[in-house]
Amino acid sequence: MGQTIATPLSLTLDHWSEVRARAHNQGVEVRKKKWVTLCEAEWVMMNVGWPREGTFSLDNISQVEKKIFAPGPYGHPDQVPYITTWRSLATDPPSWVRPFLPPPKPPTPLPQPLSPQPSAPLTSSLYPVLPKTDPPKPPVLPPDPSSPLIDLLTEEPPPYPGGHGPLPSGPRTPTASPIASRLRERRENPAEESQALPLREGPNNRPQYWPFSASDLYNWKSHNPPFSQDPVALTNLIESILVTHQPTWDDCQQLLQALLTGEERQRVLLEARKQVPGEDGRPTQLPNVIDETFPLTRPNWDFATPAGREHLRLYRQLLLAGLRGAARRPTNLAQVKQVV
């Protein structure tokens, strides 16, 4: 009897309940059939090195993410929950994933200092021996702090990312995803996606707040159709932002302000408040529960605490439900009569 060879894909299917729970904790849902189809077919056909049996390599996951988060019609917003869950399993692996993690890359060796040349034996000469001096080297970074150049060895961005320098060519388009790998991708391909991550892990594993920049909001608005024209496309965009960026309550209001009209925002908020669950899990009509779960004024939720993050997770889920509810417009009977 031959033994069955375990693969990353087969492992996830054997532990499917844990995979679904991991996705649910991130505010998304995944389905087993689509999970298999993406891994065995669609991601393989992207020609970025994704193996048919799946992988927990962050390099492969990052390559697939670049395709999924591509701007405009080239992206795949419906695949965001799946690749996000793959990344979560790779970066915070449960015990059954650890044996299948690729070995860590060896650190790049530091260049060895040049060994000093042996001094020549003393010989008599008619001329004095002068020491050889090298010409002074220019500094790697300009001394002017206002210079647009940055130190490419710096791994962490400044606390409030400001405007970026002019790009070599082509329009700037938005990007998404986790810090270290995304920083490297952005340096290699600066016109790909936005780097804003309102909530990210800081020192001592504490969440650190990074707001959206004006350029992020501008790019999302200018590269996507308005809600009135294509509500599904804009809803998919906002869903990918909610999943990957995990914005705070203030960030959500800023996002709605930038991407929706005043009437559209009112409709979205109204639909979202209709979906607030009660104690039995069904939509409630109790005003105090609705105001506490989906407030219209800024709540006192601390994203650095588990309770605050849970409030924000539910708020983002309800906001997405409100977008989908607002996208379902009632039939205009007057227009139907005109067509008939």
Curated annotation (Swiss-Prot):
- Annotated region Disordered: where? 97-208
InterPro entries annotated for this entry? G_retro_matrix, G_retro_matrix_sf, Gag_p12, Gag_P30, Retrov_capsid_N, Retroviral_Gag-Pol_poly, Retrovr_matrix
Q: Which SUPFAM superfamilies match?
A: Retroviral matrix proteins (SSF47836), Retrovirus capsid protein, N-terminal core domain (SSF47943)
Q: Which UniProt keywords apply?
A: Capsid protein, Host cell membrane, Host membrane, Host-virus interaction, Lipoprotein, Membrane, Myristate, RNA-binding, Viral budding, Viral budding via the host ESCRT complexes, Viral matrix protein, Viral release from host cell, Virion
**Motif LYPX(n)L motif, which positions?**
126-130
Provide the site residues for: Cleavage.
Answer: 127-128, 197-198
Could you confirm whether the keyword Disulfide bond appears in this record? Answer: no
Q: Does the keyword Transport apply?
A: no
Q: Where is the lipid attached (N-myristoyl glycine)?
A: 2
Q: Which GO terms describe its molecular function?
A: RNA binding; structural constituent of virion
Q: Where is the composition biased (Pro residues)?
A: 100-119, 136-146
Map motif PPXY motif onto the chain: 157-160
Low complexity bias spans: 120-132
- Gene Ontology BP terms: viral budding via host ESCRT complex
The miscellaneous comment for this protein is: This protein is synthesized as a Gag-Kit-Pol polyprotein.
Q: Which PANTHER family match?
A: GAG_P30 DOMAIN-CONTAINING PROTEIN (PTHR33166)
Q: What name does UniProt use for this protein?
A: Gag polyprotein
What's the source species for this entry?
Answer: Feline sarcoma virus (strain Hardy-Zuckerman 4)
Q: What is the lineage of its organism?
A: Viruses, Riboviria, Pararnavirae, Artverviricota, Revtraviricetes
